[in-house]
Curated annotation (Swiss-Prot):
Gene3D superfamilies, sorted: Cyclin-like (1.10.472.10)
Subunit structure: Interacts with CDKB2-1.
Name of the protein described by the UniProt record: Cyclin-B2-1
Organism of provenance: Oryza sativa subsp. indica
Organ and tissue specificity: Expressed in the intercalary meristem and the elongation zone of internodes. Expressed in adventitious roots at all nodes under submergence conditions.
Gene: CYCB2-1
Remarks, miscellaneous: May be involved in rapid internodal growth of deepwater rice under submergence.
Any one biological process term the GO annotation gives: cell division
Domain of life, source organism: Eukaryota
Region of interest called Disordered, as start-end residue ranges on this chain: 1-61
Induction of the gene: By gibberellic acid (GA3), ethylene and submergence.
Length: 423
């Protein structure tokens, strides 16, 4: 296409021009705005001839070219640049991919990488078998090394002391036989009511477990008539609050919560009697002390914590659970909760190390807890179930119980290995 025909097409845009002949000798277009008579866009191309004439260097920063025209010369330069870049990239790739030191693999030989791949399956199996051994070396206190309240330097000595002294918090599993006017069913009604009172006052977990411990230790040593059984429970909670809580409920609130069945004076008199009977010994290891440690060893989340405490509080109501030590109750609660959530028997080497119990030792107690879990919503004593059916406690009571533990039979611990592999 000649220049005249090009000028004839471009002249149709914008204002009419005087004539084709007048534009025949003009220089090739550098800016299409020159054609329509509008002021040219600020661009480096428009200013370049001025810089060449003046011979001075431009002091201002270069303007961004936002409306550069696509002329034939400019398009050709872009095409040449792309071809050169492509040739350079191909050459670089050839240099990188070429390894002059590496010889081709002769026929009948196998590369070392291929041989290692064939043995990966066996290595993976060995690693799975050694998982439990590696877990026994896990340091569960390393994350709290900078926390002075965690007392990581003395935590093992503390729990050694708790295990040595947990017998002090235990009672005879048949102490109710010495009571003439009350029985184990009345005790269950009292504990279920105390759990509701504890929830109503929004007290700490430590307070509840210490309250139940005070009640059992006092009833073991003191014969109590039926009419004063609730008084013993209210006073035990008052003592536990004084030992554990920052803000203690006033005695008048306890009078109201018991429907004014007792006076303030009666509560204070019972407080003296309990303290003298127990010789002011309020510092005893409860299941709560061990529960926190075992949950940490199990690397628990919020769901496991709530379900473990739900199962443990169900055990507080049951008189038959007094035959177990506090540490075993806590370990069995965590074990049962893990089984309910994972749907298989799970008890790691780390949990065994810190609890001092194996899965076989926990199985008997765990089966009883599964039965309590299954029947928690039925009957008259449903205080724990209602408490853990709320959103505040994660609706833990609605979790399906680990019924397969009841079906495992006497060889349950041997079955555990097969269930772990299935999981």
């Amino acid at each position: 296409m000649d220049r005249a025909s090009e000028n004839r097409r471009l002249a149709a845009v914008g204002k009419p021009v005087p004539g084709i002949g007048e534009m025949g000798n003009r220089r090739p277009l550098r800016d299409i705005n020159n054609l329509v008579g509008a002021p040219p866009h600020p661009s480096a191309i428009a200013k370049k001839p001025m810089l060449e004439k003046s011979g001075k260097e431009e002091q201002k920063p270069a303007l961004v070219v936002s409306h550069r025209p696509m002329t034939r010369n400019f398009a050709a330069s872009l095409t040449r640049k792309e071809q050169l870049d492509h040739q350079v990239s191909v050459a670089d790739a050839a240099v990188v991919c070429t390894d002059p030191q590496k010889n081709p693999i002769p026929d009948g030989t196998v590369d070392d990488d291929v041989e290692s791949c064939e043995s990966n399956d066996y290595i993976a199996v060995d690693e799975c078998n050694d998982t439990d051994e590696d877990e026994s070396m896990m340091d569960i206190d390393s994350a709290d090394s900078g926390n002075p309240l965690a007392a990581t330097e003395y935590v093992e000595e503390l729990y050694k002391f708790y295990r040595e002294n947990e017998e002090m918090s235990c009672v005879q599993p048949d102490y109710m036989s010495s009571q003439g006017d009350i029985n184990e069913k009345m005790r269950a009604i009292l504990i279920d009511w105390l759990i509701e009172v504890h929830h109503k006052f929004e007290l700490m977990d430590e307070t509840l477990f210490l309250t139940v411990n005070i009640v059992d230790r006092f009833l073991e040593k003191q014969v109590v008539p039926r009419k004063k059984l609730q008084l013993v429970g209210v006073t035990a909670m008052l003592l536990a609050c004084k030992y554990e809580e920052v803000a203690v409920p006033v005695v008048e609130d306890l009078v109201l919560i018991s429907d004014r069945a007792y006076t303030k004076g009666q509560i204070l008199e019972m407080e003296k009697l309990i303290l003298n009977t127990l010789q002011f010994n309020m510092s005893v290891p409860t299941p709560y002390v061990f529960m926190r440690r075992f949950l940490k060893a199990a690397q628990s989340d919020k769901q496991l914590q709530l379900l473990s405490f739900f199962i443990l509080e169900l055990s507080l109501v049951e008189y038959q659970m007094l035959k177990y030590r506090p540490s075993l109750l806590a370990a069995a609660a965590v074990y049962t909760a893990q089984c309910a959530l994972t749907r298989c028997q799970q008890w790691t080497k780390t949990c065994e190390l810190h609890s001092r119990y194996t899965g076989e030792q926990l199985l008997e107690c765990s089966r009883m807890m599964v039965d309590f879990h299954q029947k928690a919503g039925a009957g008259k004593l449903t205080g724990v179930h209602r408490k853990y059916s709320t959103f505040k406690f994660g609706c833990a009571a609605k979790t399906e119980p680990a019924l397969f533990l009841l079906e495992s039979g006497a060889g349950g611990y041997n079955l555990q290995k097969h269930l772990q592999q299935a999981c």
